[in-house]
Amino acid sequence: MLYKSSDRPAHKVSMLLLCHALAIAVVQIVIFSESWAFAKNINFYNVRPPLDPTPFPNSFKCFTCENAGDNYNCNRWAEDKWCPQNTQYCLTVHHFTSHGRSTSITKKCASRSECHFVGCHHSRDSEHTECRSCCEGMICNVELPTNHTNAVFAVMHAQRTSGSSAPTLYLPVLAWVFVLPLL
């Protein structure tokens, strides 16, 4: 049996409109909260190389900076370019005070000979420590060396995994599940 709009009780129509508005509000909250969560932090471990062609076989990139004041700004403003062909590693040189405050950070592409002197060296005259580390792999020099445990010559191959598209598909499906019963 079909009802004319005048045959429906007003409270049923208002309840139906309220349910639709509530469903739309829930979907919008989910969408906005998920977008905010993704944009909240910069994760330097998740950096993936671009899909542009490499200049030569086994090309790689390192975070690069010269005398930066802190690690965050070094990584954030690092120049995005391929390392020269005569280099194989990423070198990090970290100068810091006896209280652990960074005074200078240098990161660059390096040859094997530049990586022979890894470790930490304390200068009694200036009360500063210099720690040097080298690593092998695409953008492997995220962290700073701060002691003999991490001021090493490490061979670390970055994992190349493709990102999942699940969050993209999840939201439209969720929206459809909420809205479909209300129609």
UniProtKB/Swiss-Prot annotation:
Keywords: Cell membrane, Disulfide bond, Glycoprotein, GPI-anchor, Lipoprotein, Membrane, Signal. Residues 1-39 form the signal peptide. Residues 165-183 form a propeptide. The keyword Lipoprotein applies. A lipid is attached at S164 (GPI-anchor amidated serine). GO terms for cellular component: extracellular region; plasma membrane; side of membrane. Residues 60-154 are annotated as: Sufficient for inhibiting alpha-7 nAChR currents. CDD domains: TFP_LU_ECD_LYPD6B. GO terms for molecular function: acetylcholine receptor regulator activity. Coiled coil: none annotated. Pfam families: UPAR_LY6_2. SUPFAM superfamilies: Snake toxin-like. Residues 60-151 form the UPAR/Ly6 domain. It is found in: Cell membrane. Disulfide bonds join C62-C90, C65-C74, C83-C109, C115-C134, C120-C131, C135-C140. It is a lipid-anchor; GPI-anchor. PANTHER family: LY6/PLAUR DOMAIN-CONTAINING PROTEIN 6 (PTHR31171), LY6_PLAUR DOMAIN-CONTAINING PROTEIN 6B (PTHR31171:SF3). Likely acts as a modulator of nicotinic acetylcholine receptors (nAChRs) activity. In vitro acts on nAChRs in a subtype- and stoichiometry-dependent manner. However, according to another report in vitro it can weakly inhibits alpha-7 nAChRs. This is Ly6/PLAUR domain-containing protein 6B. It comes from Homo sapiens.
